[in-house]
């Protein structure tokens, strides 16, 4: 009886210990120290639907703070100090994390205890080689522009593009080789704007089932689905937005013409630089049945209308004036502008990302010279 009682007590103690340990590792604890701020507030933020929200906050006491919570999968959060510019992005995963935060240079902050964060830091260290090269080349580019040396400008631009392409290749190879890491999924969705449908298919195929529940993996799958609906050969998704006087205009109302669905904004420098090329194409081919359907990602109606007038954009323009939340942009998977899609007279997509001479050549192919 005594042995049975002793065994029961021992079992109860062991279960208690296991229970306590489970509670400690069930979620995450962030223990942080701040250099340069003994008081104030720490804000833990995360990105949801393109917007930054505050997930938690805690008061700093004697330069220290502690945050607790739980995540289903490792995920990037942003640590921000109230009334201090900038934020520090880092991977949170369940367990105990230790942070060293520097109030005067928050981007130099560090985190230990997160395997995913360690992997991200290692990647960033290797990627920095390319960033340093591009920074140096940008300095050379600025000097060449100031001295009006067009030959030097061209040489530097070519060199910069070469390094940028090498960086993109490095990142893509990292993603494809590390499919078991949520970091790869995070990097992939962060660079998704630059990936074709074929790229995304390969990346999604490389993702390990063990990280299938990651929000980043799910977003990659959604991205692939969207792009598959707007690739050449597909019927252009229908949408209706208001024009500059508030009248609803549907894309389908232009059926029977070759249409360039052109995503742009008044605040977008590259868009404004490309507008003269679109104007030239419109003037050359409008009489042959070509038109443009301008979709603006503006939020300010006056600035939108002013840009239309200044750039001489004499075609139909629509917008919902909610910036990147633009319904049509989301429908077409637009993550950067300028972006465009060329439709034939039946409303079928026959090209995309056509700029400058490429647009002219494609229109000559479709409508003749």
What is each of the regions a protein language model found here?
Residues 20-169:
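A non-transmembrane, solvent-exposed segment enriched in polar/low-complexity residues
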Residues 272-311, 321-330:
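Structural microenvironment flanking redox-active thiols in thiol-disulfide oxidoreductases
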Residues 85-87, 97-99, 103, 153, ...:
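N-terminal targeting signals for export/organelle localization
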Residues 1-32, 368-369:
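Bacterial Sec-dependent N-terminal signal peptides
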Residues 190, 311-313, 320-368:
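Thiol/disulfide oxidoreductase modules built on the thioredoxin-like
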Residues 255-256, 263-280:
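Conserved redox-active cysteine motifs that mediate thiol-disulfide chemistry
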